[in-house]
Regions:
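A short acidic, helix-capping loop that chelates divalent metal ions and anchors anionic groups
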Residues: 11-14, 74-80, 110-115, 173-177, ...
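N-terminal pre-domain/capping segments
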Residues: 1-101, 133
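Residues at the N-termini of beta-strands
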Residues: 35, 103, 202, 234-235
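Active-site groove signature of glycoside hydrolases
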Residues: 96-116, 144
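Alpha-helix N-cap and loop-to-helix initiation/capping positions
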Residues: 16-23, 46-54, 80-88, 113-124, ...
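Acidic/histidine-rich catalytic cores of soluble enzymes
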Residues: 18, 35-36, 69, 126-225
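Alpha-helical scaffolding segments of alpha/beta enzyme cores, especially the outer helices
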Residues: 23-27, 50-61, 84-98, 120-130, ...
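A short helix->loop->beta-strand "cap" motif at the edges of active sites that frequently abuts
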Residues: 64, 101-102, 137, 230-234
Length: 236
C-alpha cells in the first residue's frame, strides 16, 4: 500500500495552519509520504492551466504522486441541479487531466429508495463515466454514507470500466462517526467493508478520536486484514 494525505481539512485553528495546496504539498513532502489527493474547491489559487501545471511539477519534484481530485457527485435534485453537477464533474476531469490525477472522486449519499431517482442517479454517473473514457480519467465512488449493497448496485448499474470504489472507512450508514463513537446496531460497517473491499481502487482512512494514540471509534485491526484479504495494493 501507498500512504498519502487528502488536502481538504484545512484545520480548525484560525487562521488555518495549512491554508493552501502549496502548504499541503510541503507538509506531505516533510512527512515523506507517497502521494497527495486534492479537492477541486479547496486550496487552489487558480484553475488556469499554467497554475495547474506548476502544481503538478511541484508534486513531481517532491516525489509525490497525485491520487485523485475530489469532485462532487450526490446526483439527486432537480434536472437543473443534476445538469450542473454533471458538468462540474466533467470540468473537474479536465482539471485532473492537467494535474496528472488519474481519477476524480464522486459521492453517493444515503441510499435512494425511489426507482426514478435511482435511474436518474445512474444516468448521471454513466454520462460522467463516458466523458472520462474520452479524456482518460477514472471515477471513484465514495460511500458518504452508504451501505455495501448500495455501493455495489451503483457500480454494477453504471457499468463503466473506469468506475471504481473509493473506500471510505468512516462514512458508512450506521458508522460510529455519526454518534460520537456509538455504532448503530442495525448496520454492520465491517460487513459493508467486507462486501466492497474487492472493488476498492483507493482508500480514505478516517480518524475521529485518537487521544490515546490509537483510533478508538473505527477498528483498523479489523479493516486492514479486510483490505489485505481482498488483495488491495492501492493508496491509503
Amino acid at each position: 500500500m501507498k500512504i498519502g494525505l487528502y488536502a481538504s481539512m484545512f484545520g480548525k485553528d484560525d487562521p488555518p495552519t495549512l491554508q493552501s495546496i502549496e502548504s499541503y504539498i510541503e507538509h506531505a513532502y516533510d512527512l515523506r509520504l507517497d502521494l497527495i489527493d486534492f479537492r477541486s474547491d479547496r486550496g487552489f489559487s487558480s484553475s488556469e492551466p499554467d497554475y495547474l501545471i506548476k502544481t503538478k511539477l511541484t508534486c513531481i519534484a517532491k516525489g509525490l504522486s497525485i491520487g485523485y481530485l475530489a469532485s462532487g457527485g450526490h446526483f439527486i435534485g432537480t434536472d437543473e441541479e443534476l445538469r450542473a453537477k454533471v458538468e462540474q464533474a466533467k470540468a473537474d476531469m479536465d482539471i485532473a487531466l492537467i494535474l496528472g490525477a488519474p481519477m476524480i472522486r464522486l459521492f453517493c449519499g444515503q441510499p435512494l429508495t425511489d426507482p426514478e431517482e435511482r435511474k436518474r442517479e445512474i444516468r448521471c454517473f454513466q454520462e460522467v463515466g463516458d466523458y472520462g473514457l474520452k479524456v482518460g480519467i477514472a471515477m471513484g465512488l465514495q460511500n458518504h454514507p452508504s451501505t455495501g449493497d448500495d455501493v455495489i448496485r451503483i457500480i454494477e448499474e453504471t457499468d463503466r470500466p473506469n468506475f471504481g470504489f473509493l473506500f471510505d472507512t468512516g462514512q458508512w450508514c450506521g458508522s460510529p462517526a455519526f454518534n460520537r463513537g456509538t455504532p448503530d446496531p442495525e448496520h454492520d460497517i465491517y460487513e459493508y467493508m467486507q462486501q466492497t473491499a474487492h472493488l476498492a481502487t483507493h482508500v480514505r482512512a478516517k480518524f475521529y478520536k485518537i487521544d490515546s494514540g490509537r483510533e478508538e471509534w473505527i477498528d483498523y485491526e479489523r479493516i486492514i486484514p479486510i483490505l489485505a484479504e481482498a488483495g488491495y495494493n492501492g493508496a491509503l
